């Protein structure tokens, strides 16, 4: 990553998955304030959890600068006229631009700090920050049905999305984050629902009795969106065959994409809408396959002794996160589909699975049963920085996360 600084500008190129090296430098007025230790902890936490910064003397090992790491910038912390001022400066301490936050009753709103750091991230990288964005997931309540719930990146503002008497599964945010797709399961069968988050839901597809028509599907489940939000790729079953179909939301017409006698599920479409990855049991166990939509060419992507599932394209279309089961445990892997290079992100004598990307591609949310019950966790894309997302009681099970840029 090439970076140069002057007192007037910051030039950044080749960001990739790197993080900016930052030193927090409290000024005298900040240090003299009785709340300064607490404020500094909050600032450190949000810079770390943004996924964009490494900080000198951070409380978080995964975000702490070590050794003689070269600084990229400084952030000067000051207090003036009931304002917390975070001034971005070059490595010599020359101020570049200030970020200001109102203080009331010796406190400030953390949501405003998150917004400020998101704006700083966008100024530096051109990509909006993810602090305060929304993660939807399946929540299993004790002795009750599964619902679709949502929470923000700090584990706050927990709430229900689905409000129907059926079991709700597989949430998938629309590209504009204004609606969410999920599958419901009831005594009447399965259905794919589009929830527009304002009390309005639309049933896009519903399973029907197989004998009533050769066209009807005996099972339907949600999948992946095209980037224009007008079409989906979904899993549909007719007879004894389960395949992937392209589905037009407006016309309600479907087009079959896979025509193999195997069971094919879990579609994930690349950001450019040209490349599809999915799960198939063509070899007798689940593996990940790739299909080029323009030519129809498909081939196997994952190899190894165990099964592979849950593929998810990164937001820039360069990597695929997925789950591999080996020696009885599921772990999250990262695959470069073009070079074939594969990296293991999680390890342990427990399961970690169902990865989903952050909108900026710097973090992954996933489900793990490391405590005995499946809960949601976050980590950076290099596998470091693992932390529990929610504070939901132990007997609630959390799974199938999906991350949106929608702020909560």
Residue ranges and their predicted role:
Residues 128, 139-147, 165, 183-192, ...:
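A flexible loop/linker signature enriched in serine peptidases of the S9 family
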Residues 5-75:
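Short beta-strand->alpha-helix linker/helix-N-cap micro-motif
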Residues 152-167, 196-221, 247-263, 291-309, ...:
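Multi-bladed beta-propeller domains
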Residues 64-119:
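Amphipathic beta-strand/beta-sheet edge segments enriched in Tyr/Trp
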Residues 2-20, 96-160:
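C-terminal/domain-edge helix-coil "capping" segments
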Residues 129-131, 175-176, 227-228, 271-272, ...:
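Residue-level detector of Asp-centered blade-edge/turn motifs that repeat once per structural unit
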Residues 135, 180, 229-233, 273-277, ...:
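Hydrophobic beta-strand positions that form the internal "hydrophobic ladder"
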């Amino acid at each position: 990553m090439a970076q140069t600084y002057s007192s007037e500008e910051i030039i950044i190129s080749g960001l990739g998955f790197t993080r900016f090296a930052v030193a927090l430098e409290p000024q005298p007025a900040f240090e003299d304030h009785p709340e300064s230790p607490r404020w500094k902890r909050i600032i450190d936490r949000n810079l770390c959890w943004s996924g964009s910064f490494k900080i000198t003397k951070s409380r978080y090992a995964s975000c702490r600068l070590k050794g003689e790491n070269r600084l990229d910038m400084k952030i000067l912390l000051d207090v003036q006229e009931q304002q917390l001022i975070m001034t971005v400066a070059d490595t010599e301490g020359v101020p570049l631009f200030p970020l200001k936050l109102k203080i009331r009753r010796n406190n400030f709103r953390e949501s405003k700090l998150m917004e400020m750091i998101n704006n700083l991230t966008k100024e530096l990288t051109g990509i909006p920050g993810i602090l305060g964005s929304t993660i939807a997931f399946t929540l299993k309540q004790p002795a009750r049905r599964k619902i679709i719930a949502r929470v923000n990146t700090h584990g706050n503002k927990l709430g229900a999305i689905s409000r129907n008497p059926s079991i709700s599964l597989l949430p998938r945010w629309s590209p504009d984050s204004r609606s969410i797709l999920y599958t419901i399961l009831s005594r009447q069968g399965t259905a794919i629902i589009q929830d527009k988050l304002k009390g309005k839901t639309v049933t896009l597809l519903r399973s029907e009795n197989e004998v009533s028509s050769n066209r009807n599907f005996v099972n339907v489940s949600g999948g992946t969106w095209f980037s224009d939000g007008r079409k989906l790729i979904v899993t549909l079953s007719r007879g004894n065959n389960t395949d992937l179909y392209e589905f037009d939301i407006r016309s309600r017409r479907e087009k079959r994409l896979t025509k193999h006698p195997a069971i094919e599920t879990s579609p994930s479409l690349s950001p450019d809408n040209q490349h599809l990855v999915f799960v198939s049991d063509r070899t007798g166990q689940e593996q990940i396959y790739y299909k080029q939509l323009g030519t129809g060419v498909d081939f196997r992507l994952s190899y190894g002794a165990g099964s592979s599932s849950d593929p998810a394209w990164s937001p820039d279309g360069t990597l695929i996160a997925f789950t591999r089961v080996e020696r009885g445990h599921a772990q999250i892997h990262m695959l470069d589909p073009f070079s074939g290079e594969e990296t293991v992100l999680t390890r342990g004598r427990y399961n970690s699975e169902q990865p989903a990307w952050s909108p900026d591609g710097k973090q992954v949310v996933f489900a793990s049963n490391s405590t005995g019950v499946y809960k949601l966790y976050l980590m950076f894309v290099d596998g470091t920085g693992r932390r529990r997302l929610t504070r939901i009681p132990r007997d609630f099970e959390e799974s199938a996360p999906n991350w949106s840029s929608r702020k909560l």
